[in-house]
Regions:
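Short amphipathic alpha-helical face segments that pack within enzyme cores
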Residues: 37-40, 76, 80, 97
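Generic, well-ordered alpha-helical segments
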Residues: 30, 34-37, 69-73, 90-91
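DPxDG-like acidic metal-binding loop motif
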Residues: 58-89
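Short glycine-rich anion-binding loops that position phosphate/pyrophosphate groups of nucleotides
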Residues: 11, 64-65, 115-118
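Glycine/Thr-rich phosphate-binding loops of Rossmann-like dinucleotide-binding domains
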Residues: 14, 69, 119
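Surface "functional belts" at beta-alpha junctions
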Residues: 21, 88-134
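Phosphate-handling active-site elements
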Residues: 48-54, 83-94
Length: 134
């Protein structure tokens, strides 16, 4: 089975389909019409990957921090996908995801996300076996 990951927390709408490895992804600059753009992106990567939506077994959603309205749109679309397919929705903190992706096992990490209007969210992490902790 496949997983769908969605991020609408920033200037870009990003979606990806993966199992043990990345199968297909898309990242598109969002100016207006986030809902339509997100649905179109999901449709495009499923078609490109030749995967039926019914083959998706879980949706991972970036729940922020980030742009408030875009996060709400991402949540609404993700809930609709999960509700229609009867699959779980797993929330993922964007700062935690960045730290985990950047960890080397040896250095402290500070993740920073622009949350609009010259405001930023950040968090410090330290390495532990298998990942990072706040």
């Amino acid at each position: 089975m496949y997983s769908l990951s969605i991020s609408t927390s920033g200037k870009y709408i990003s979606v990806a389909i993966h199992d043990d490895k990345l199968i297909s992804s898309s990242s598109v600059l969002s100016e207006n019409g986030t809902t339509n753009l997100l649905m179109k992106s999901i449709d495009e990567i499923t078609k490109k990957s030749r995967i039926e939506k019914s083959d998706i077994s879980v949706v991972y959603l970036d729940i922020g921090p980030g742009y408030y309205t875009s996060l709400r749109i991402g949540l609404a679309v993700a809930q609709g996908v999960c509700g229609s397919l009867g699959i779980p929705l797993v929330p993922v903190n964007g700062l935690d995801a960045l730290a985990f992706a950047a960890h080397t096992g040896h250095r402290k990490i500070c993740t920073i996300i622009d949350i609009k209007r010259e405001e930023y969210a950040f968090c410090l992490y330290k390495p532990v076996p298998g990942g990072v902790v706040r």
